[in-house]
Amino acid sequence: MNNIMIKRLLMLPLAAAVLLTGCAKSEKTNDHETTKRYLDAWVGVNYPGVTPTELGIYILEDKPGTGEMYDAKQTFVIADYTIRDLDGNVSSTTDKKLSQQIGSYNASYYYGNHVWISGEDSMAAGVEDLLMGMRVGGTRTALIPSWLYTTDRYKNKSDYIKKKIKNEGSSGIYTVTLNGLSNNILKVEIDSMEAYSKKYLSGVDSTSYGFYYKQVQAPTDTNAFKSDTTIYINYTGRLLNRQVFDTTDPDTAKMYNIYSSSKTYKPVGIKWGDTFSDIKMTSSSSDD
């Protein structure tokens, strides 16, 4: 796993895993029974012999993995995914190459492993059903009906079909590769950071668990900043896959294809404080 901003990145896959808003064409209807008949017919034509699971998703393709088996009790699911509508149009993907092929690639976006929170109230019922029986390393493609986008849980399939879902989307085809499972996502992140540090930052230091730094130039003044001081810095933000996602340097931005003419590339102000929680980044620059 190679994402460093776990709190921020968690929100992205959760939006896909909880809302699961695919864009199927012309089959959306308030009558779930009618939609179900449409999906049965679509599967019968395109995937003869495939029948729905007990909950109601259609597993279209399955490449088994050999690692740990998914268990809903596992708190975190680490996965790659691609979402398509019934015509095959991609609405969302973590696959960089695929994104480039379809013209939706954005150099500032993160592509790769995403983290979903498992279980009721967090993961959509249809995604949980897709993951059931999967092992780490496996890839599964399934058609998930729109009524299984809910994070609520009911006793049987008919209960899901009867319920109306607020802001319900259309049914979609989800291809998911299960890359890992964990009850301790912090350890996963720390292990990834330590591996990165050993590979790219020889001589790295740490002042606390989970914080690593490498001094590339000694300061000319080692006196501590006063709490009312504003300092100005340049920075470049990089994910653990080496992808640059933000910078104050225009040349660096151009090099990594994230330059924007609407952005001002200048040192940013840091308002110092007595504790780390008091330290704030401001929008002001040194020549404002």
Q: For each of these PLM feature ranges, what is it?
A:
Residues C23-D288:
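Cross-family detector of peptidyl-prolyl cis-trans isomerase
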Residues M1-C23:
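Sec-dependent bacterial lipoprotein signal peptides
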